[in-house]
UniProtKB/Swiss-Prot annotation, chain A:
It comes from Salmo salar (Atlantic salmon). It comes from the Eukaryota. This is Alpha-endosulfine. Its main location: cytoplasm. Residues 1-27, 77-115 are annotated as: Disordered.
Length: 115, 447
């Protein structure tokens, strides 16, 4: 649909554009080589499934009712449930109660933007 | 009336206000996640990671200082969303406000939609400046009077009171999204709106919360075949049957709801062909579109991918009509940007009131404006250092080569933790709101 009659200056511009595009491509390929050197096992389909899956699964935490009940039983001997230093660890004592699962409580403090 | 814009031709941007704490220790809840002016520009809303909404109102211009535009001061603040845990799916649902969209004003009250990953809420913000006084059976403090002491009857009257701004949730649109909501968009018919998650787009009626229509579904039967996700969606500003959605593969699909109930078949597909020799591991990631916005005119749309802003003419699907490089110098840093996850940062973009200038954020608290008419661009910085009232912002420059000129900053010195993802432009005037991590800056043109 678009006209392809390019004037001289436009041709020069197109050439320049192509040069800089090649330069850009080389820069990016250089970065790719660096990355592959660091992570040789990086998947064949970089933008593909693994990556998108990770994005779709954001927020996934694992709750085990067996762990929960075990920890609840243990809690009788403790004052307060102690959340482990690594909050992402999902087995055993590290998920004692549902109260700990929403790791963050809602902000009871007014936003500082309104201060 | 908005002038020629931010390209530096005749507009000089000045610091006006900054909101938020000064200290460097940023609580996660204070991270600003969305910024939006209402349709008149009188109100400016922000949402944060803590699920809170703060609304600022522009003060009326004072007669003493006709050269100054009104300042934005806090009008209302409320907790919009709370953190939740979905026990059935073992999913933690963040309270972070992903998007706020204002409804056009129809009566005295203001309405906005705010959404987190799973639930959209319609909030009504209303003013109360009078209250009834003179009840027969109640004292002013609410205690009931002893009926035997009532000897006369009177009619309660409304008396003026200090202005109170109340926010109340009027509708809760829940349980319609399996995946994470990235966009909401109010239709020009003012009756419906869409909400989009990674794989589906739903159409809602603002009055009805227990039902929504699925209008786009790109979930493959076999999830292993998943190759792209929906990244943003928006209704056309005046054609109520038209909307667009962008993907992680750099394509934009325009759909017409008159064509069929399920708009899986696009009416138009906008995609810029890539030179296969340029293909790299990073190609798809940096082509992922993080934001799509129609121009006010409805003739164009703008997309933001990792390195550039593109303007598309809705009449031409083959390639954008304009491309602006936001921070091309990052091409030589893609490896480290992938390692520190910055390559996945989702920058937004916005148009000025007359569609002549577009703006987007970058790193080091820099933000960029591109004047489409004058073909000029400028890089400005949102920082406390340049926040003296009405001080003119100095253009910034990143040097890529070896020789760094005075006042330039080298690529290696850029702070990638200081990112400006969210910006907004007043619908009529040259007033912009720029969000750094936890501060909101307001800049105006020099009058």
């Amino acid at each position: 649909m678009s006209s392809e009659n390019l004037s001289d200056t436009q041709m020069e511009y197109e050439d320049e554009k192509q040069d800089s595009q090649e330069k850009n491509a080389n820069l990016v390929k250089g970065e790719e080589v660096k990355l592959k050197a660091k992570y040789p096992g990086l998947g064949q389909k970089p933008g593909g499934s693994d990556f998108l899956m990770k994005r779709l699964q954001k927020g996934q935490k694992y709750f085990d009712s067996g762990d929960y009940n075990m920890a609840k039983a243990k809690m009788k001997n403790k004052q307060l449930p102690v959340a482990g230093p690594d909050k992402n660890l999902v087995t055993g004592d590290h998920i004692p109660t549902p109260q700990d699962l929403p790791q963050r409580r809602s902000s009871l403090v007014t936003s500082k933007l309104a201060g | 009336m908005a002038g020629a814009g931010g390209g530096g031709n005749d507009v000089q941007w000045c610091f006006s206000q900054v909101k938020g704490a000064i200290d460097d220790d940023v609580a996660e809840a204070d991270i600003i996640s969305t910024v939006e002016f209402n349709h008149s520009g009188e109100l400016l809303a922000t949402g944060d990671k803590g699920g809170r909404v703060v609304i600022f109102q522009q003060e009326l211009e004072s007669k003493n200082q006709p050269q100054c535009r009104g300042e934005y001061n806090v009008y209302s603040t409320f907790q919009s969303h709370e953190p939740e845990f979905d026990y059935l799916k073992s999913l933690e649902i963040e309270e972070k406000i992903n998007k706020i969209r204002w409804l056009p004003q129809k009566n005295a009250a203001q309405f906005l939609l705010s959404t987190n990953d799973k639930t959209i809420k319609l909030w009504k913000i209303s003013e109360r400046d009078k209250r009834p006084e003179g009840y027969n059976l109640k004292e002013e403090d609410g205690r009931y009077r002893d009926p035997t002491t009532v000897t006369t009857l009177r009619v309660p009257v409304f008396q003026p009171m200090d202005l109170m701004v109340e926010a109340s949730p009027r509708r809760v649109f829940a349980n319609a999204h399996t995946y994470h909501i990235n966009s909401i968009s109010v239709n020009s018919d003012c009756e419906t709106y869409l909400s989009a998650d990674d794989l589906r787009i739903n159409l809602w009626n603002l009055e009805i919360t227990d039902r929504s229509f699925n209008i786009v579904d790109i979930k493959p039967v076999n999830m292993e075949e998943l190759t792209e996700v929906i990244t943003a969606a928006e209704f056309h500003p005046n054609q109520c049957n038209t909307f667009v959605y962008s993907s992680s593969k750099g394509t934009i699909r325009l759909c017409d709801m008159r064509a069929s109930a399920l708009c899986d078949q696009h009416s138009k597909l906008f995609e810029e062909p890539e030179d296969p020799s340029n293909r790299s591991f990073f190609s798809e990631i940096i082509s992922s579109i993080s934001d799509v916005k129609f121009s006010h005119s409805g003739r164009y749309m703008m997309t933001r991918d990792y390195l550039s802003v593109k303007i598309w003419d809705l009449n031409m699907e083959s390639r954008p009509v304009e491309t602006y490089q936001v921070h091309e110098y990052l091409r030589s840093k893609l490896c480290s940007l992938y390692e520190n996850d910055c390559i996945f940062d989702k920058f937004e973009c916005c148009w000025n009131g007359n569609d002549s200038v577009v703006m987007t954020g970058s790193y080091n608290n820099f933000f960029r404006m591109f004047d489409r008419g004058y073909r000029q661009d400028v890089t400005l910085e949102a920082s406390r250092e340049s926040s003296k009232p009405r001080s003119v912002l100095k253009p910034r420059k990143v040097c890529t080569g070896g020789k760094r000129k005075k006042d330039e900053i080298s690529v290696d010195s850029l702070d990638f933790n200081k990112k400006i993802l969210h910006t907004a432009w007043h619908p009529q005037d040259n007033i912009i709101a720029v969000a750094t991590t936890n501060n909101l800056y307001i800049f105006q043109d020099k009058l």
